[in-house]
Amino acid sequence: MAVLRQLALLLWKNYTLQKRKVLVTVLELFLPLLFSGILIWLRLKIQSENVPNATIYPGQSIQELPLFFTFPPPGDTWELAYIPSHSDAAKTVTETVRRALVINMRVRGFPSEKDFEDYIRYDNCSSSVLAAVVFEHPFNHSKEPLPLAVKYHLRFSYTRRNYMWTQTGSFFLKETEGWHTTSLFPLFPNPGPREPTSPDGGEPGYIREGFLAVQHAVDRAIMEYHADAATRQLFQRLTVTIKRFPYPPFIADPFLVAIQYQLPLLLLLSFTYTALTIARAVVQEKERRLKEYMRMMGLSSWLHWSAWFLLFFLFLLIAASFMTLLFCVKVKPNVAVLSRSDPSLVLAFLLCFAISTISFSFMVSTFFSKANMAAAFGGFLYFFTYIPYFFVAPRYNWMTLSQKLCSCLLSNVAMAMGAQLIGKFEAKGMGIQWRDLLSPVNVDDDFCFGQVLGMLLLDSVLYGLVTWYMEAVFPGQFGVPQPWYFFIMPSYWCGKPRAVAGKEEEDSDPEKALRNEYFEAEPEDLVAGIKIKHLSKVFRVGNKDRAAVRDLNLNLYEGQITVLLGHNGAGKTTTLSMLTGLFPPTSGRAYISGYEISQDMVQIRKSLGLCPQHDILFDNLTVAEHLYFYAQLKGLSRQKCPEEVKQMLHIIGLEDKWNSRSRFLSGGMRRKLSIGIALIAGSKVLILDEPTSGMDAISRRAIWDLLQRQKSDRTIVLTTHFMDEADLLGDRIAIMAKGELQCCGSSLFLKQKYGAGYHMTLVKEPHCNPEDISQLVHHHVPNATLESSAGAELSFILPRESTHRFEGLFAKLEKKQKELGIASFGASITTMEEVFLRVGKLVDSSMDIQAIQLPALQYQHERRASDWAVDSNLCGAMDPSDGIGALIEEERTAVKLNTGLALHCQQFWAMFLKKAAYSWREWKMVAAQVLVPLTCVTLALLAINYSSELFDDPMLRLTLGEYGRTVVPFSVPGTSQLGQQLSEHLKDALQAEGQEPREVLGDLEEFLIFRASVEGGGFNERCLVAASFRDVGERTVVNALFNNQAYHSPATALAVVDNLLFKLLCGPHASIVVSNFPQPRSALQAAKDQFNEGRKGFDIALNLLFAMAFLASTFSILAVSERAVQAKHVQFVSGVHVASFWLSALLWDLISFLIPSLLLLVVFKAFDVRAFTRDGHMADTLLLLLLYGWAIIPLMYLMNFFFLGAATAYTRLTIFNILSGIATFLMVTIMRIPAVKLEELSKTLDHVFLVLPNHCLGMAVSSFYENYETRRYCTSSEVAAHYCKKYNIQYQENFYAWSAPGVGRFVASMAASGCAYLILLFLIETNLLQRLRGILCALRRRRTLTELYTRMPVLPEDQDVADERTRILAPSPDSLLHTPLIIKELSKVYEQRVPLLAVDRLSLAVQKGECFGLLGFNGAGKTTTFKMLTGEESLTSGDAFVGGHRISSDVGKVRQRIGYCPQFDALLDHMTGREMLVMYARLRGIPERHIGACVENTLRGLLLEPHANKLVRTYSGGNKRKLSTGIALIGEPAVIFLDEPSTGMDPVARRLLWDTVARARESGKAIIITSHSMEECEALCTRLAIMVQGQFKCLGSPQHLKSKFGSGYSLRAKVQSEGQQEALEEFKAFVDLTFPGSVLEDEHQGMVHYHLPGRDLSWAKVFGILEKAKEKYGVDDYSVSQISLEQVFLSFAHLQPPTAEEGR
């Protein structure tokens, strides 16, 4: 039951996701309909011709050779060969034949057939040999007579000599050479009579090639040999004629020709997009870790696959139903695409194919971990498995049943063979019916439709098994692999024996032995929710083992939040991954709720809530749907779900967002939702990996409150990079370093162990004497130490144990402040950050934290000194420049940046190398670019050559027995005595052979017409020959009738009659068995298989187009990726010119395209494709390919603007290329078949499609080939030239002629469209189109702004903000040039249904050497402001100036002066850190000789040197932020924008970043920074503003804002554990009484956190009161610090509406 519930839930999830992806869903349903629509459209356009009367054919004489053979062959006489030459009987018979055939001819004998074949093959004499008569008797000596039962075969020329030119559109009806002796019926049957205009039956030419004349002459000669006189006498009164069966009224329908060839390909194309989508959707869940996350939540793997299967099956069922409807619905009276087939069987076939397609895509998905690659290779493999059909189709008749079945192991080949069978049954006039399921289409074939369906289902099972195995053994980056032999392990099938829960409780606690001073005693009254014992994890990197976690022992308790800290790479995430079952541990154990992780993961997952570091959300599910889905997945009943979801929405504060899709949520909201998912359904154990990363202060607070409220009955473990978060939330804090646990305890415990105590910072006046102050401090606190004395700042460390002495010290300092020359002083407690840094330093002494006290920390001390100032008025501005700054300034001025042409060349080179690096690193894709076209074309050529290399035709017995049991009608009109005699013999002979003679009393031809009308297609297989015997005057005419639907019926009919005459003359034992065994091809003929290769050009073009569809799409991948991650924007901000950016890409891509193009020429040469390689045409072929590259690459660049992700772009562009190439090419080509009668429409469409490079390539390649072969044929001989003229076969001497079949128009259009697409690309990139639109919208915008301003509530403006505005709006031209950044009344309105004012009239000036902080809640407008200032977004009104240049009109010059670090890392994964910095240095114009030093300095400053040569994709989040900042700083831009630069960094990395930024500031840069970390703003910013609703609400230095908007202190205290509760209540009452208005912020485990208000409280007073309370209330420890900037920030929270989205 639970399984069904989970399945239903997954189906609901998949269906909902699919429903929201409207375009994908529409395409999945639309493409099959489109291709079905093409067939319907053709069906409507192709007129079928009704032939209302029966077709009667005249009789044909076989007494003499056709007229053609009366002319001698070139320079010779005809030869009649016989074998064996040593037999007199054979020679006698042959001479008799020569005399009978009355043409000038000589007889030549050969000892054996081998001699004859050598003569034909190598002496090039086949043209003069009329035929060879080979007697199949040993003839032991020359006089041995011919037996009565004669067997012989005739060997005529393989190439027909007297064939009429038939132009039925050689693309589809490939007129093969030869006698078709491999088959009895055509491979593709025709509706109506075969060759309706040929009374002699046409192909293979039994009458017109003289075969029947020779056969009859040989038969008569054999009769004469055995009964000379009787034979002459018989033939004096008897004439044998041959006549074609009449054909009943029929509808001539050329459409059925097209469908037999094209239905397989159209079905393949119909499902191609779905195949790509399936692979992409499945892999995307794997790539985003959603699949593994669902598994952690308790989902079975087979259920996951089943749900996907059912969803896609449902969609394909709908598509297949519509296709069946379109195929079988009558579009005209009695006319449909498939007029006669059973719709239910067609649907069954399509569904079997759909199932195999889904299974195939599942199988492909298991080989990839990136959705892009899965889609790319999936599409290629999907088509690749169709290519073998090109081999199978031409040699279908040669293949055995087992070979056919084996080829059906590829589902696309099985589908093609099934579609071919449907076409054949349609053409037979019967259609496919359920009764035909196990019947072949004709006697030639042993393969039936039921076998196709069976093989499609078998394929699905086999693909499923591969999927199951691959997923188990190679689960991808985030799964746990099984051993390769897992399927033979009993434990896999039966499960492991359950470990007894609770058993581990008894184990001795190994941590006790290890307890040392850095591990606080564990709480004894709490239950351990998680127990970790000796846990280790070793990863194999290359050929080395790397320990990520070493021997970890830790207990995590219920009702507590345990915080796990560690710098990037310390082993935190690995530990959590082991606990959640993502990785198996290498050794050790862990128990969660009593269950062991490696054995009982299924049980554990039921109570496990997980919030990973990355948001594991489905883009298109709403907030409520996520909660509903995961609650049900964890096992909550459906009835309880709505209430639980409602409650959770309330808990996480997303009630108003319940119906918003997750992709529209801000980062903070996404994290809240992730936490909600972890909490829902009563999870007892919560594992939260950096739950608040990327949130603003207010959202973070909300999460903290949420976790504090939820922890009571849960075990919560969380990791974070925010030390204040660890301090505030952590009941116990564990710090890891290098994979080992270093310490564990409460925040106060760790501060006692590692912390120095209080930092007291004093700001000195000029007359201050540090010695006096030092004496005073040491007098009151003897063990105080001087921390630093730098510039105007003096800093002491006061030990915690001396807090009782602080009151006296502070009182003395306040009293003697002026006398000692102290401007201000303050104190701050050891922070958690210092503890963390100290632990890191102890572990790794090489990373000396003291060495990192660069300007950032010094400046922070300066800030602190003024922050805790007793008298804020005394705080003056400080000169930021010092020695380091001066040094950097000097270095900068020494380097002169490139400009003009030198800069453009340098930028072009940088962009070119970027593309080169991409190709080098993504070598698999480059390999695919080369191999896909080569493989497709090579396989096509192999298939074509294989089909035309053609085996020599085998021997075929011309007897009725070959056709099984048949009916032979005969009639004897009148009272002919000889006729009666003959008919009796005929009956006996046929019955002896197992045939069914049937006497017809009326007119034989009328009978045949009637039976054919009644029986339809079956008649042609059951009735092949007939005979009539009638007297005409004195003679009896024996008329042998043949059914021309079978190839060999003329000779078979004649053989029946001649046998009859032989039996009449020589008795019942006489018989003649004749066979047709065509001569082998001569070397000349093999070389001359020409003209009728029209389809070869078509096949090459089709395969080339398919390959190019995949190849061309790859050119968009980097463009889309760069745009998606904003790397392109950062490159433009760094000054790259549009032309350098795109033309360098175009040049590289053309070079990349040249390689497969040249290799294609090699392939053409290897296969000797004459049209493309001979007569100087190699250059033409290369030109065609390169012009295609020139046209398609800019088109792919243009299309990149439509997509947000590389995977989506790749799949959709591949489909676009297939549609714009193959579909249009097929449409035009099919219409060009003369029989279809749509030539004019095909010309019109051909002209319309000229704008599509794919279409041009297909048509050009096909036309070029066709023109070459036609021209070669028509100029090969006078006879050929005569034929070409007679049948109006056109060709062009000039291959580049404009009209068909010249390729001039395709060449010109590809050349022109390449230019057009490039121009359009530049228009878009240079914003010219946007500017035009902007001018048009300007009037409307002014109106919108005015309306918005009047609608907005007028909020009071802060005085500092008003003063800044006044100063900026005052006219002062000098300030424009000397101020790095000036913002004047900047506004941004987003045009939507309700216009949104995102930025509202900002005015600001940022000076040199200033770091300006832009603070605000998510949605306040910070990121929008950045986007406008960097030129990514247009300005609605106002303006901004960088170095005097307007952003609105001179964005190019502005960008050369700014550096930009966006909020999300705009990095290129395929480059190393060093390569990226070098690239940006070149973009900035740093001369090449200085780049190395400049990059080294940046790497050193950011401590990125160890990672400089690693690929960016391997960087941790922190290192990526460092690199992004380095990119912004390189090249010394005047203005630097940093959007949340330190997100995701650990404290050490963050400090280093601050140092770098501080150095840049001190060198005179203007820096604008946004951050969620108030600590960062205090450390770096000289001024800051807080934004609310797009406006500045306050502006000034951090201390100014704290003094203006904040007051009071923050108090934390911990009460002793004995009698804790009682003492705690008393202490709380004391605080409330002593500090009126105090607010209790937090309370847990005897710990309290208060906010103490009041500006009049002095440090001395606070410490005095608390020291007295310490003894009285049993306070173990306490700490006091001044209110933080964060609290000032939070005081503005109520002004920001909660619904505003991030990024505005």
Swiss-Prot record:
Instruction: Give the reaction(s) catalysed.
Output: ATP + H2O + xenobioticSide 1 = ADP + phosphate + xenobioticSide 2; a 1,2-diacyl-sn-glycero-3-phosphocholine(in) + ATP + H2O = a 1,2-diacyl-sn-glycero-3-phosphocholine(out) + ADP + phosphate + H(+); ATP + H2O + phospholipidSide 1 = ADP + phosphate + phospholipidSide 2; 1,2-dihexadecanoyl-sn-glycero-3-phosphocholine(in) + ATP + H2O = 1,2-dihexadecanoyl-sn-glycero-3-phosphocholine(out) + ADP + phosphate + H(+)
Query: What inducers act on this gene?
Result: Up-regulated in Leishmania Viannia (L.V.) panamensis-infected macrophages exposed to miltefosine. Down-regulated by L.V.panamensis infection.
Enzyme Commission numbers on file: 7.6.2.1, 7.6.2.2
For the keyword ATP-binding, the answer is yes
Per the UniProt entry, the effect of R605Q is: In SMDP3; uncertain significance
Q: A Pfam family in this protein?
A: R1_ABCA1
Please describe, based on the UniProt annotation, the reported consequence of changing H1069Q: In a breast cancer sample; somatic mutation
Q: Which GO terms describe its biological process?
A: lipid transport; lung development; organelle assembly; phosphatidylcholine metabolic process; phosphatidylglycerol metabolic process; phospholipid homeostasis; phospholipid transport; positive regulation of cholesterol efflux
Subcellular localization, as worded in the UniProt entry: Endosome, Multivesicular body membrane; Cytoplasmic vesicle membrane; Late endosome membrane; Lysosome membrane
Q: How does it sit in the membrane?
A: Multi-pass membrane protein
State the tissue distribution. Answer: Expressed in brain, pancreas, skeletal muscle and heart. Highly expressed in the lung in an AT2-cell-specific manner. Weakly expressed in placenta, kidney and liver. Also expressed in medullary thyroid carcinoma cells (MTC) and in C-cell carcinoma.
The record lists the effect of K1388N as: In SMDP3; decreases phosphatidylcholine transport; increases protein abundance; does not affect folding in the endoplasmic reticulum; decreases proteolytic processing; affects lamellar bodies development; reduces free cholesterol transport
Q: What is the effect of changing L1580A?
A: Decreases ATP hydrolysis activity of 13% compared to the wild-type
Record note on what altering N568D does: In SMDP3; does not affect location in intracellular vesicle membrane; does not affect proteolytic cleavage; does not affect N-glycosylation; loss of ATP hydrolysis activity; decreases ATP binding in vitro; does not affect protein expression; does not affect multivesicular bodies and lamellar bodies location; affects multivesicular bodies and lamellar bodies development; loss of phosphatidylcholine transport; does not affect cholesterol transport
Q: What is the effect of changing L290M?
A: In a breast cancer sample; somatic mutation
**Keyword terms of this UniProt record:** ATP-binding, Cytoplasmic vesicle, Disease variant, Disulfide bond, Endosome, Glycoprotein, Lipid transport, Lysosome, Membrane, Nucleotide-binding, Repeat, Translocase, Transmembrane, Transmembrane helix, Transport
State the similarity comment: Belongs to the ABC transporter superfamily. ABCA family.
Record's disease association: Pulmonary surfactant metabolism dysfunction 3: A rare lung disorder due to impaired surfactant homeostasis. It is characterized by alveolar filling with floccular material that stains positive using the periodic acid-Schiff method and is derived from surfactant phospholipids and protein components. Excessive lipoproteins accumulation in the alveoli results in severe respiratory distress.
Name under which the protein is recorded: Phospholipid-transporting ATPase ABCA3
